């Protein structure tokens, strides 16, 4: 099914930017709410901080950029196209996205599922590039906050 050629709809850049903005603000609000409820760092963040101290900052930054793009291609392109129904697409890719980030608590689990759902919403409303850009911007924000 995935190897068949399909027509890719062109997405207006304004629409893409609009949904990246909506997604970013939504992720920010959700993350702030979860942080107020439970201010403990996640297993994923602890692993990233440990890795950050082992490699030069530029290599780590490239790793984050690469991870954002590869994750979005896997979840919001390959797996996304294996399922036809939108609600199942979003649910499946969000749960798998959360599992890949090793949530250690129920709240961390909810946060990563929410992140996956918003990335899925942006993927649906714009395109893969929209979700890749949002994921990348989000990772860069988290990385810069980890530096301070």
Give the predicted meaning of each segment.
Residues 3-67:
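Juxtamembrane helix-loop-helix connectors linking adjacent transmembrane helices
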Residues 57-148:
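Transmembrane helix-loop-helix hairpins at the membrane interface
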């Amino acid at each position: 099914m995935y190897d068949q050629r399909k027509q890719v709809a062109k997405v207006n850049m304004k629409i893409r930017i609009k949904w990246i903005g909506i997604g970013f603000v939504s992720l920010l609000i959700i993350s702030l709410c979860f942080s107020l409820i439970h201010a403990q760092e996640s297993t994923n963040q602890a692993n990233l901080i440990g890795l950050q101290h082992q490699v030069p900052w530029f290599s780590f930054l490239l790793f984050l950029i690469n991870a954002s793009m590869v994750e979005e291609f896997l979840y919001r392109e390959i797996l996304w196209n294996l399922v036809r129904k939108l609600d199942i697409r979003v649910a499946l890719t969000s749960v798998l996205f959360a599992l890949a980030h090793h949530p250690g608590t129920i709240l961390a689990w909810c946060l990563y599922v929410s992140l996956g759902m918003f990335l899925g919403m942006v993927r649906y409303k714009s395109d893969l590039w929209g979700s890749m850009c949002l994921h990348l911007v989000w990772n860069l924000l988290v990385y810069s906050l980890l530096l301070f």
